[in-house]
Amino acid sequence: MTKIDKILSKILIDPYDQTPLTTTANDEGDIISVESQNGKSYPVINGVIDFEGGGNYADNFGDQWTRFPKLQLDSFNGTTISRDRFLGALKLSSSELRGKLIFDVGCGTGRFAEIALESGAFVIGLDYSSAAYVAAKNLKRYKNFRAIRGDIYKLPFKKHSFDLVYCLGVLQHTPDVERAFKSLPPVVKHSGSLTVDYYWKRFRSLLGWKYIIRLITSKLKEQTTLKILRVV
């Protein structure tokens, strides 16, 4: 079993009743099954532990990143946009991340996790959408990463598990922002840190074209939106 999976097996709990979970690994050391004490099992698909399945409010994000899986990765687009934003938000140097156990909340396709992994951190990324599967594929070259599909309101981790928890550009997309935020501090170690940011929606900024367009496109079916984009 890889080191990240050994760590994960010690901190995982059932997100619905908070009881410990048992993980089973194959001969290569990869987790292949997760079971609760009450006999409930959760699938492990393409390396992703899936506590959700089915559809949810984040489906559009998952579909978006399935179509454009590497768009935001610095390693793909040749920029340092993700790196600069990530380290700027954390106010840390990359060397300070080495060896830390990090929780990426709303990991998307892994744009920020990639930076942390390159710095030598151990990263667990969680996303409510199918983007978790995209992150697992994008970052499979890293043996210190594990993706989970789960709910920010029902985190599958014991209290005080992580050295660092970050949630960047995610909270404003959740149905209940306050509840989402309050779910994060309990999983941070007493000596750890939590970094959260959000989009500042001043009245003036809401008049921008992208927000006006979003009011329209958010009501359209995905295929309709894509057809419009192709024409434009």
Question: Each PLM stretch: what is its role?
Answer:
Residues 178-190:
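A short glycine-rich, Lys/Arg-flanked "PGG" loop and its adjoining helix->strand segment in the class I
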Residues 111-113, 174, 202-207:
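Short catalytic/ligand-binding loop motif for oxyanion handling, primarily in non-cytosolic enzymes
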Residues 193-225, 231:
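Conserved class I S-adenosyl-L-methionine
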Residues 164-175:
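A short SAM/SAH-binding and catalytic strip from SAM-dependent methyltransferases
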Residues 154, 172, 201:
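Active-site micro-motifs of SAM-dependent methyltransferase domains
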Residues 1-156, 164:
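Conserved N-terminal segment of class I S-adenosyl-L-methionine
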Residues 133, 174-179:
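Short N-terminal helix/helix-N-cap motif within the alpha/beta-hydrolase-1
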